[in-house]
Amino acid sequence: MTDTTPNGLLDAFWRYEAALMSNNLGELDRLFAPGPWTLRGDAVGLLVGHDAISAFRAGRGGAPARSVEELHVRAIDDDAAMIVAVVRAASGGRGQQTQLWRRGVDGWQVAVAHVSAPARVVDGTIWRIVGTPLVAGTPGGAAADEADAADAPDSARNAAGDSAGAPEPGLSGREAGSLDGETVAVKDLFAIAGFAVGAGVPAYLAEGRPATETASAVASLLAAGADVVGIARTDEFAYSIAGRNPHYGTPPNAAVPGALPGGSSSGPASAVALGQASIGLATDTGGSIRVPASYQGLWGLRTTHGAVPVDGLLPLAPSFDTVGWLTRDGSTLARAARASIPGVRRELTPRYALVDVSAAFQGEGQAGAGDGQGGEVERAVGEAAARLRAAGIDVDTEPVDVGDLAELAESFRQVQAFEAWGTHGAWIRQHPGALGDEIAARFGAASAVGAEEAGGALRRLHAHAARIAALAEDRILLLPSAASGAPDARATPAQLERVRSATMRLTCIAGSAGLPALSVPALSVTSVHGGRAPFGLCLVGARGSDLALIERGREVAAALTV
């Protein structure tokens, strides 16, 4: 260390501050060292390389206003120095910024930076409302709800089908105290007594009345001892898998800074990935649990259709709406599922088969938004299957054909659209301008799907569903959880529509047949900003095999991480 500040360093620092406050992207790019070794980190994650840092800045819309209160320089030599700045945000609170500056042919540039922003009480992109807790669970579980399979609603008891098996000895649907100490982020579609449902739409929330009863899916977790920490954001009316909300902002992707979090269960997913909750209570109609789980490296379960009661849940497309959970590990997911699914367990033979999904990626666009990754995604899943075989797990050598994926996805889209408009169309007509452009356009297209068209699509869908269900009777299907890694947060609507179309050709396989689907965070693909991004391997099981599917998923994850 030297005792003097190198010439020109402070001038460069103050140029950086001025550029930051004016959002001068060109100057900021010049003041950060070029190349793949430049680093910028904060509480959300680490950006590696100049290009990733530049893309992050371009997508965030400027830094919050602040002033520098203290400045500490520690020179390393004539051409390198550390600067630690204490900053005060205009909105209140203090933070710190640590930078390693190096002098080269282009003058002083930042090589490494770490930002500690003033602590936010609540991140409004993730949460609608939080408490400490918002709703307390029942410690030691639940005398309050001693329901077992015999007392469960008929819809839940029958969801597993005739072959689901008998209640497992000693297991109740809600295990007393099994979730003590766990915290839950509840997607803003579930009723919680005393709070209105907002569904990601401010105008809908403004007219909502506080619920008088709590949804069964929430009550089950509370009865097992979990606390509800808050109500988490969703895409508008849950009609998206991107994770963007034009009213409240985009929740951060904890695994890939600068990328989309995935939706529509974006808030619960980000809350869990960031450690702000241990369980995300969510819904999955066309992939809204599996996609954010894949994008953020989480475990995510779409349950058998009807396995978890949906009373107190704002629907989108009832034929496909399911309840499920997002967690950071398989053990917590298993406990959440046991606390919520009546005590009927169907076992699964540990036999697996890859699904031929090559048709899902036809017509992809250029890479850069996360689309165009079909080849890499297929290779990753194929290599995973080979590794499972090498570990002694029974994986069929030939992929299975689930039928015409394009026709399946289009039939699914038409039925989903018809039901979505039936659910929300009247309200949308009465509230022009209440939705953002992308979701408004999607509902506009849904309004054009008539009953005759939807009826034909439903008949085709039933034929596809029967074939898929038959394939899943004696093997667990393996396929990608999504069509790509997390797209760039700056992706255009056209780019996201391509990603959505390819992903829906995958997610509708389980959704059309009402089968449970588990996203296991066992794979990775190239990140949109370089490096690696998490990616989910999806396991699809027979109806009613939800609990066994999680256990098989844990075995698969263990085999792939050896």
Positions of PLM-derived features:
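General beta-strand structural signal in soluble alpha/beta enzymes
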Residues: 186, 228-233, 281-283, 398-399, ...
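Alpha-helix C-terminal capping segments
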Residues: 269-279, 511-513
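Structural helix-boundary/capping segments
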Residues: 116-125, 279, 285-360, 366, ...
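Surface-exposed, charged secondary-structure patches
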Residues: 8, 39, 47, 51-94
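Gly/Ser-rich catalytic/binding loops embedded in alpha/beta enzyme cores
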Residues: 75-77, 84-85, 99-112, 117-269, ...
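Glycine-rich, small-residue loops and helix-cap segments
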Residues: 334, 455-562
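Amidase signature
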Residues: 119-179, 339-504
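Short, solvent-exposed secondary-structure junction/capping segments
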Residues: 10-21, 29-45, 284
